Amino acid sequence: MKNLLIIFSLIILTKVSYSQGCVAVRSTGNTCSMDQADLSTKWKLNLNNRYFRSYKHFVGKEEQKHRVDSGTQVINHSYSLDITLTRKLTNRWALGITVPVISNVRSSMYEHYGNTSKNPNARRKTKSFGIGDTRISAYRWLIDPVKSVKGNVQAGLGIKLPTGDFRYQDIFWKTDSTYLMGPVDQSIQLGDGGTGIALELRGYYNLSHQLGLYSDLYYLVNPREQNGVSTARGGTPNANAIKYFTSTMSVPDQYMARVGVNYMVKKLSIAAGARLEGIPSSDLIGGDGGFRRPGYIVSVEPVISYELKKVQLYASVPFALERNRTQSNSDKLITAAT
């Protein structure tokens, strides 16, 4: 690998959340890279770091502020390192593999002693750590990069493999001396248990030598409906969970879109854009049963990057403008029944 381009990227998200303090959106990899048609190297190693903390609760677009005020909010700390190795086959074709390493910590009361408990030990933590779901993709520039130097569009098609442990378990304390061992919450599981199809579309257009536009589109199709993992945290599912199909975890689709403008000054690049990411309540293929937390986040996304010979550094800190915890299929069934 004589010609190896290494990219380090850092994405930090704070105060991002859906209902129950959870963000179920998993890392998509390479979301901080604004690649152009690089003809100088055959290999590229991308190390994409992403961290976020979630603690707010939403019903629709309305924040449930009383959860924070009462101290019963759920707090998630999630970190992922996406390791992506890309091999350029020709000027237009490339192959890539992404392997995420994930570490999660979840703090709550309702999963343990209960939100009404006055015990000072009522808030407990569950954790998960390991390899996430691996993605293998093929990419093609739709326009010959040699002929089109101002702009191009790259399409990607891949397969997402269920290499992450989607049955990860930890301890749920019920009193100071009694506990249950069971699957951790869906938001901190290392994988979803499904084999998916990853669709990507990336484009750029240079308005001048310094000013350019970029866009990224990503959609993960997960045909599997449920993965069979219990949501009862080591206990027995209640009648309503069984009736409304939330006793096991779903395998939902996922999407992400980014658009923006970047300005380059020698080796420094500054970008500003918008970012949309979320989980739909209904999948493109397969059923919609099982427990999921659908919704979306709209953010502004400043990005700064710097190039050091064969190493590129990226950093991004998105700021959420809108959060919407939409109804799942089960939520709709409950609403119709009541």
Could you describe each region identified by the protein language model?
Residues 20-21, 34-42, 54-56, 92, ...:
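Short loop/turn motifs that connect adjacent beta-strands in outer-membrane beta-barrel proteins
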Residues 36, 47-49, 83-87, 97, ...:
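Residues on the lipid-exposed face of transmembrane beta-strands in outer-membrane beta-barrel proteins
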Residues 43, 93-95, 146-148, 210-213, ...:
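Repeated loop/turn-to-beta-strand initiation elements of outer-membrane beta-barrel proteins
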Residues 49-55, 99-105, 133, 142, ...:
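Transmembrane beta-strands of outer-membrane beta-barrel pores
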Residues 51-80, 187:
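Surface-exposed strand-loop-strand hairpins of Gram-negative outer-membrane beta-barrel proteins
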Residues 58-60, 67, 225-338:
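Outer membrane beta-barrel transmembrane domains
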Residues 72-78, 125-132, 189-195, 249-253, ...:
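Short sequence motifs at beta-strands and strand-loop junctions characteristic
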Residues 107-247:
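Outer-membrane pore/translocation modules
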